From Swiss-Prot:
Main location: cytoplasm
The protein's name: ATP-dependent Clp protease proteolytic subunit 2
Localisation: Cytoplasm
Source organism of the structure: Chlamydia trachomatis serovar D (strain ATCC VR-885 / DSM 19411 / UW-3/Cx)
SUPFAM superfamilies: ClpP/crotonase (SSF52096)
Entry-linked PROSITE patterns: CLP_PROTEASE_HIS, CLP_PROTEASE_SER
Enzyme Commission number(s): 3.4.21.92
Purpose of the protein: Cleaves peptides in various proteins in a process that requires ATP hydrolysis. Has a chymotrypsin-like activity. Plays a major role in the degradation of misfolded proteins.
GO cellular component: cytoplasm; endopeptidase Clp complex
Top-level EC class: hydrolase
Keyword line: Cytoplasm, Hydrolase, Protease, Serine protease
C-alpha cells in the first residue's frame, strides 16, 4: 500500500491535518502519479469538476508521472480537460507514456511543460483478445477504431499528421523533453517553477 503523507496547517482556529493531495488541490494542483485506471480517472475527474465549480476561469495544474493505462479511463480525463472552461497546464515529471502522453499533450497550447529528464512515449493501443471467432473479430475492430481515434487526437494536439502519428506509434516511440517539443507534445522544458506562465506555481 502506498503511504500518503499528511501535512498540518495552521488555520487561525487551530491546526488541521490533511493528506498531501487534498492540500495540493487547494492550490488547484492535480497529480496523476500511477497507472491510469477507471478509479483513478473518476478521482481526477471529480477533482477537475470541483476546481471548475470553485473558479471556472483560473488555471488548473496537472502533474503527470504515469506509464499509461486504460484507454477509456484516459479518454474520460481527456474529455473532461476539454470540457473545462479554464486553461489547463500540464507537466511531465518522470514519464508520460501511452495515455499519459496523450493527457500531457491535451493541456492548453503554450502551457504544456516537461522537466529536463522526463521521458515521453506513444504507441498503438493493445489488448488481449479471447473468446469466439466472432468475439475476436469484434474486439479487433474495436482496437482498430481506438487506434484511429487516438491518432486523430494526438494529431490535433501535436500538429503532426495522422499518418505520421500512426507510423510512429506502430512501435513504442520514445522521446526526451527536447524531442517532445519538436514533436508538439509539449511547449517548453522547464527546470524551475518560475519558468511557467502560472503565477500560483511560480510564486
Amino acid at each position: 500500500m502506498t503511504l500518503v503523507p499528511y501535512v498540518v496547517e495552521d488555520t487561525g482556529r487551530g491546526e488541521r491535518a490533511m493528506d498531501i493531495y487534498s492540500r495540493l488541490l487547494k492550490d488547484r494542483i492535480v497529480m496523476i502519479g500511477q497507472e491510469i485506471t477507471e478509479p483513478l480517472a473518476n478521482t481526477v475527474i471529480a477533482q477537475l469538476l470541483f476546481l471548475m465549480s470553485e473558479d471556472p476561469t483560473k488555471d488548473i495544474q496537472i502533474f503527470i508521472n504515469s506509464p499509461g493505462g486504460y484507454i477509456t479511463a484516459g479518454l474520460a480525463i481527456y474529455d473532461t480537460i476539454r470540457f473545462l472552461g479554464c486553461d489547463v497546464n500540464t507537466y511531465c515529471i518522470g514519464q508520460a507514456a501511452s495515455m499519459g502522453a496523450l493527457l500531457l499533450s491535451a493541456g492548453t497550447k503554450g502551457k504544456r511543460y516537461a522537466l529536463p529528464h522526463s521521458r515521453m512515449m506513444i504507441h498503438q493501443p493493445s489488448g488481449g483478445i479471447i473468446g469466439t471467432s466472432a468475439d475476436i473479430q469484434l474486439q479487433a475492430a474495436e482496437i482498430l477504431t481506438l487506434k484511429k481515434h487516438l491518432s486523430n487526437i494526438l494529431a490535433e494536439c501535436t500538429g503532426q499528421s495522422v499518418e505520421k502519428i500512426i507510423e510512429d506509434s506502430e512501435r513504442d516511440f520514445f522521446m526526451g523533453a527536447e524531442e517532445a517539443i519538436a514533436y508538439g507534445l509539449i511547449d517548453k522544458v522547464i527546470s524551475s517553477a518560475k519558468e511557467t506562465k502560472d503565477k500560483s506555481i511560480a510564486s
